[in-house]
C-alpha cells in the first residue's frame, strides 16, 4: 500500500484540523472543511488505510482519527508549510529584537519570553557563556585603596568583567597602568580558557616583580571571570494546563517536575530530532526523558561567527502548531540576517 498524493493531502488536513480543534477528525469533517475533490466515503477508506499504515490512530471514544507520532513526523518532514504571521506578531517580534540586538544573550532570553506569550507554549532559552568563548581585548587594574585593586577585563564581544584583588604591596595607579599594559600585550587575543600552565608561567616570569599580584589576578581570571557553562530561563511553565492533553493531574505534575530540573531540560533540548532548516524537532517518544514523552520540543539554534551561543525551545503537546513556530523562527532569522 503506497502513500499517494490523495492520502498525503488527507493526512495533512487531519493534522492541521486536529492541531486546531484537539478533537478526533472524521471523514465528513474533512469533506466539509477541505476541497479535496473526493467524497466522504472515499476519504473514510483512505483514512482506514492511513491508520493501517500507522499514520493515524482511532481513539476508543470516537469514530474519528487523530495523528500518530509517525503521522506528525511525516507532516513535519514533508507536508508542513509556513503559516503567515499577522502584522501584530511581526511588530512585537521586531520591537523585542531591535531592543536587544547588540546583546545576543539578552536577545535570546527576552525573545523567548515574548514567544511564550505569542504561542501559549512553554519556552526555554539557553545561552552558552560568551565570556568563555570571547577573547581578551583589554585588561585594566585600578587602585581602590592601599591593598585592594579592581581587575577589569574587556572582551572582543563587548563583555566587561570585574574582580576584586588584594595585594600585600602598595602599587600606585601609574604602576598598575604599566602592569595592565604588559598584561594586555601578553593576553591580547587569548581566550580565558587558553590560560594553560605554560602561558601562566610565561606571564609570571615576564612580570616577576609582582608575582604575588599576578598569582591572584590569574586565579581570578580562571575562576571568578568564568561563568557557568550555560544560563537557562524558562517562560510559560503553566501554559501547558490550557491544553486538554494535560488535564490529567498526574501528567501535568510530571511535566512541572521535569521543568524544575535545569540540567534535564538542557539535555533534552540538545537531543537530536527531525532537522528542518535551523530547527530541531523532537516528537513524543523520541524524547530521551520519560517525563517529556507526551510532548514535542522544537528548538532553534543561534550562532555568532559560527560559534553556538544559544537556543530557544518551544515545549508543548505533540499536537503543537509546528507550522506557526516554523514561521516565527524563519521571521526571526530574517530579522537577524538584516542586522
UniProtKB/Swiss-Prot annotation:
One of its GO terms (molecular function) is DNA binding. Keywords: Repressor, Stress response, Transcription, Transcription regulation. It comes from the Bacteria. Pfam families: HrcA (PF01628). GO terms for biological process: negative regulation of DNA-templated transcription. Negative regulator of class I heat shock genes (grpE-dnaK-dnaJ and groELS operons). Prevents heat-shock induction of these operons. NCBIfam families: hrcA. Belongs to the HrcA family. This is Heat-inducible transcription repressor HrcA. The gene is hrcA.
